[in-house]
Amino acid sequence: MFSFFKSFLPTSYFLPGWLILDTNPVDSLLQGLVGACGISVLCSLMRVHLFLVEESSSDESDEGRKRGTPCRERRTKTGLTGMLQFFIVTGILSVVGSRVASLVVLEFCLRTVSGLVTSGQEYRTCLRQVLVQSQFSVGCALSCSLHFLHEGASQRWLCLLLAAALSWFLARQATRLMHHVMALYKLHSSQRYCGVCISLLSSGQLLLPMLCRTMILVFSVAAVASVSIINQHFLSATEALRFWTPLTICYTLLVVYMQDAQHGASGSEVVLNTVMVRLGGLMVLMLTVGRWADVLHILMCFLGEASCLIPTMDLLDAASSSQVRESPWKQQTGPQALSVRRDSQTGTEYRCVH
């Protein structure tokens, strides 16, 4: 179906081999679209979660409510800027090869496990920061997972087209939910008018665990796919060992360095330093044991991380804020949420939780 369009694409007669895409450009574009939709869903649901937390905490003081309203209004203004960012991320994920995407996934998995294990009492704050920082890594995880699962399929483009359509639908629904909650949650939750807002009011604390379970599933599949994709480029066990040994050492040193550098720095500063250090380390590694195509793709990863993190710095600051360190649903179970009611007929007292 796409053979006519593929005939106009550059071939190895005009471009060097390291500039040629690993797969069909149409397949790469569909994989990038799925990855960008996954990033959009993650950002929308994280904004909903942090909005619920801030809304619950701002109800305690009028000053907090006045200070929180402009921030929420600014977050809802996406429009053309949001669509431009979406298509930029789609293009970057389409260009980045499956090999470099696999390396990004493995590095993120190792860094996340190490960070959560050493987080201590700041576990929930660290978890929110990890979810915000994982945007481009989620796109790489979905892209390399689709590359691995559909490799060798006779109708690969059709499967990817269906996956892209479903991802687009989920991204649109998540965006609509975000705008609905930010605009009407306070009114609907107070008047018990909207089923969606009432569900979030009663079960909003389940949103973060649901996101965590989804991320665990996504990166578990992506980790298996990444190891398989990387091993496909080696003809013998000696070549594989020569690649995996410096890779493991480099990843371990990067994780240790970033854990030490996070102390005493602000949230935005930590994120920018982390991106520069880990992608810089990957570039040095690829210059040593990789290919020129890998170096080019890592440079594209710099742009991808920037296009994901810079527009969502407010989201990262909200995830790092001290106002959301303790879940507001836990606070509502204290003594202030208790009331005593007496039955007029039997005289029995009941203790109610609001």
Would you name each region that the model predicts?
Residues 125-251, 257-258:
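Generic multipass alpha-helical transmembrane bundles of integral membrane proteins
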Residues 155-157, 243, 290-302:
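Loop-to-transmembrane alpha-helix initiation sites
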Residues 1-167, 354:
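N-terminal signal-anchor/initial transmembrane insertion module
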Residues 42-54, 169-179, 258-262, 306-327:
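Transmembrane-helix exit/juxtamembrane "anchor" motif
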Residues 245-259, 267-286:
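Hydrophobic alpha-helical membrane segments
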Residues 1-36, 40, 300-354:
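Cytosolic, intrinsically disordered low-complexity tails and loops
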Residues 49-53, 67-78, 120-133, 182-191, ...:
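Short, amphipathic, aromatic/basic-enriched membrane-interface segments that mark the entry/exit
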Residues 144-149, 259, 281-295:
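Hydrophobic alpha-helical transmembrane segments in multi-pass integral membrane proteins
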